[in-house]
């Protein structure tokens, strides 16, 4: 799946706020390297750099366009291309930080267990994942894909990612790994200019697998049909703007010393 750093950063302030909220719950780190997993264009990496300057920091991402943007933004740092599903975390690491990436990997709890085992005592795994598959933005992606004009392009392939496990599932699995764990949900209400802005937002993330599945000639038609549904689902407020409701799941697991 191809990503666009330019599309993603159209809403950089809104996308970075959850990373700030996640990092605020990481109180201190032991000695050792820190990693921004799924670093994207480097917006979250910059937050970590400014907070924990004594820990060598590396950004990891699977997309070359995102890595190019991150290297331009933070030329003093190291950025590596890797698939997180198979990436081997270095032992005695101080921080694994992951803002909005592991929702794309269905077996991510197994990966969390692997990351925790690579933490130094006192090290932290900090994760934020969108938990918005039941929101109109994502329900309508699937409804549009099922329309007769587009259904053939999606036959035999799943564009929709899997739902997240329950919070209890994370707690039960991860506490067995000798960590202190904190799990919570936050619902953000983003004030966007209009319904078209919502479409532009999800074009940078959730819509990517749907658009990638379609032939280029049919993407504009899909976007038009989807945008029409979004305008009906998100009513305009008195000032002309719309509210985008966005639930996110946070997990902070710190290895016991």
UniProtKB/Swiss-Prot annotation:
Its main location: cytoplasm. Keywords: Cytoplasm, Methyltransferase, S-adenosyl-L-methionine, Transferase. CDD domains: AdoMet_MTases. It catalyses: trans-aconitate + S-adenosyl-L-methionine = (E)-3-(methoxycarbonyl)pent-2-enedioate + S-adenosyl-L-homocysteine. NCBIfam families: PRK01683.1. This is Trans-aconitate 2-methyltransferase. It comes from Sinorhizobium medicae (strain WSM419). Belongs to the methyltransferase superfamily. Tam family. One of its GO terms (molecular function) is trans-aconitate 2-methyltransferase activity. It comes from the Bacteria. InterPro entries: Methyltransf_25, SAM-dependent_MTases_sf, Trans-aconitate_MeTrfase, Trans_acon_MeTrfase_C. One of its GO terms (biological process) is methylation. It is an enzyme of class 2 (transferase). Its EC number is 2.1.1.144. GO terms for cellular component: cytoplasm. It is found in: Cytoplasm. Catalyzes the S-adenosylmethionine monomethyl esterification of trans-aconitate.
């Amino acid at each position: 799946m191809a990503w666009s750093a330019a599309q993603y950063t159209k809403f950089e302030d809104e996308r970075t706020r959850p990373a700030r909220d996640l990092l605020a719950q990481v109180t201190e780190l032991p000695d050792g390297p820190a990693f921004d997993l799924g670093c994207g264009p480097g917006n979250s990496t910059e937050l970590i750099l400014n907070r924990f300057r004594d820990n060598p920091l590396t950004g990891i991402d699977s997309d070359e366009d995102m890595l190019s943007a991150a290297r331009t933004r933070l030329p003093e740092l190291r950025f590596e291309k890797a698939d997180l599903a198979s990436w081997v975390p270095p032992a005695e690491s101080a921080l694994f930080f992951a803002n909005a990436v592991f929702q794309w990997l269905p077996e991510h709890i197994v990966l969390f267990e692997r990351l925790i085992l690579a933490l130094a005592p006192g090290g932290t795994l900090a994760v934020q994942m969108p938990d918005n598959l039941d929101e109109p933005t994502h329900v309508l992606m699937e409804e549009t894909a099922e329309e007769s004009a587009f259904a053939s392009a999606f036959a035999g392939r799943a564009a929709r990612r899997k739902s997240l496990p329950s919070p209890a599932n994370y707690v039960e699995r991860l506490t067995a790994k000798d960590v202190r764990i904190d799990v919570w949900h936050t619902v953000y209400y983003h004030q966007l200019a209009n319904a078209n802005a919502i479409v532009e937002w999800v074009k940078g993330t959730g819509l990517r697998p749907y658009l990638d599945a379609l032939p280029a000639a049919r993407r504009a038609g899909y976007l038009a049909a989807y945008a029409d549904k979004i305008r009906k689902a998100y009513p305009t407020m008195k000032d002309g703007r719309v509210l985008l409701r966005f639930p996110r799941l946070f997990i902070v697991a710190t290895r016991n010393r």
